[in-house]
Structures are given as C-alpha cells and as structure tokens.
Amino acid sequence: MLTDREEQILDLLRRDPLMGSEALAAALGTTRASINVHISNLGKKGVILGRGYVLAESPGAVVIGGANMDLKARSQARATSHTSNPGHGSMAPGGVARNIAENLARLGDRVHLVSVVGRDPLGENLLSHTAAAGVRIEHVARTDRPTGTYTAVLDVDGELIVAIADMAATAELGPDQVQAARDVIASAGVLVLDGNLRRDALEHALDLSGGVRTIFEPVSVPKAAALKDALDSRLYAVTPNRDELAALTDLPTRTDRQVRTAAATLHARGVELVWIRMGGRGSWLLTTDELIEIPALRADVEDVTGAGDSMLAAFCHVLLDGGTPEQAARFGHAAAALTVASAHTVRPDLTPRLIRATLEQKELP
C-alpha cells in the first residue's frame, strides 16, 4: 500500500514525469531530502522504474456496461404520491459501469470503459465529462439510438422513491464491442461487468476473462434475474444486495440463515467471493468457509445515488493495490459514506487519501 505522500508525488508525476525533486518539494511544501526518500521507496515498490521519472503501468481495470445521463428530481418536503411536488432537478453523467469507471479514475487507477452511447448532445456531454475525469473511452461505441437516461425521484432526505431507467442504447452493446476490447481485458487486473449487459455480451466477456479477477454487479432485481444462469467459476466475485441475491439464486433471503444458504449456492457454482449489501447493517463478505460482517459507516445523507458504484470502485482500487478483500470492502464502505454525503453521483474530490482519513475517523471508538 502507498502512503499519502507517495500518492501525492505520483499524482504530480503523472501530470509531469520530468518534474524534479526540487519542484516536487516546492509543490508539496517539504524538503528535497524527504522527496528523495519517498522516490527511493516508490522505486523499491516497483511504482517508479527510473529517474526521469518512468512510472510503472499498473494492470488497471476494465468496466463493461451501462453509461447514461442521470436526471434527478428531489422534493423540497416529504413527497406526496399521485400529485406534483415542489422540488429541484439536476442532470449529470451516470450509469453503473460509467460511474464505477469514473470513481476508479478519480482514485488514480488506469481504467477503460466499454459501453455504448447515442450520437446526440447527451452522448457528447457524457463522453466529454468521462474523458476529462481520466477514463479511457476509446471502447465506447456510438449508436443512432438516444443516449440512455436514468430518471430518479428523491425524497426530501435524499432517499430514492422511484427510478426509471431507459437503457436502449446499452442494449446495442453486444459481443462485437466486447471483442474489440479483448486486448485491454486480457491485460486488466480487474474486470467489472454490470447487469445492464445483454446475456450474449456478458457471456463473451466472461469467455475473454481467463486469469482476470472478474466481478459481476447485478444492478437491479429484474436484471439479476435475467442473467442468473450465466454465473459460474469464471467469476471472482458477485456483489448483490439481499433482493438481488434472491433473484440470482431463486431462493428466499429474508433471514440471515437464508442469505447464507443463497450465497452458498453461488459458491457451489464456482464464485469465490459473494459480497452482499445488507442495508443499514453494512455488508457481508463471504468466502466458501468464512463470513466477515462489515458495519456501515455513519454519514449525513445528501443523496444516495451512486453510493454502491463508489463502494465497488473503491473495492477494486484496493484489490489492484494488492490489498485483501476485507481491506477492500472496508475501504468501499468509507467511499460510499463520502458519496452519500455529497450531492454528486460521483464525488469529484474523491481520493484514496480522503477515503483513508474517513475510514480512520469513523472507525474510532
């Protein structure tokens, strides 16, 4: 794991690999001697390959699935059904796969997005924003269908009342688009597949994933049910909530015992990790022989949209950095707490340093 100072140095070197130790020291308000010690340590860790400075290319992540525009409306008071409610609206790039990719980029990871958007102003806006955040978008295809939209209605406290997803453009994402990304998939450290994928696209991605830790994010109950038969030993992890777990396994998940039984059926299919969102209780991380309960972190909720996406992105970030699944899950909870406290679906100031500080602060007795 890198220290906060090492990550700050790497961030500067990514922008300017020829930056010298004196300039680094000035930018960070420290001494050249201190910078040289950190540079030496980064070399020992294999992150910097030489002076100049040459940064080692980490395996990075590939995320395949939905990219759309989020349209959010929030009520000014407790919402009343079957009538209009005063409130305010906003629009920003979204989509589960795209959100995960942007979060990973903001955490400093190399990430490719594989998706489809329309040849329309919404698609242009989405791609411009996503690329500016650091996501590689050369494998995002264009279609004549309109760019997908996710319309969410939030109550006064930021909790979701209802959402409607129009993912017609993502339905254009088939095996051919996945095949075009085969080289970046083969070299990835983590591959994330979201439940917006068609069955044939999901199957093809799994066929290309040999040797790559592959994670399936179900997205919703209907989408989990549609793809449940594709889950097998090609997957490293599955990340459902309780309702999605029931849809994936055709088993009840009302009690804790039932949740464990349902998770065991995924293990029996060859899935190594089942990471279950348990609502206010936090999450369960299950292997074939261990259950780790991870409590949710307290947060002042501004908007719950995107919390699960940041949680999974932070999980992947720690895996790419060599951490354990438990470390990754705890890091994910801290990222989710930061995200729900923000009005943004992807928190723009999200960094590993901020997440670590939040984790340390909220885990204090």
In which residue ranges do the predicted regions lie?
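Conserved beta-alpha-beta core of the PfkB/ribokinase-like small-molecule kinase fold
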Residues: V190-T261, R281-S283
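Glycine- and other small-residue-rich loops at beta-strand/loop junctions that grip anionic moieties
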Residues: L28, G89, S115, V140, ...
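Glycine-rich phosphate/adenosyl-contacting loop at the front of the ribokinase-like
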Residues: T3-E6, L10-R15, M19-A23, A27, ...
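Conserved N-terminal subdomain of the carbohydrate kinase-like
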Residues: E57-P59, M69, A79-H88, R106-G189, ...
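Alpha-helix/helix-capping structural signal
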Residues: A67, D243-E244, D289
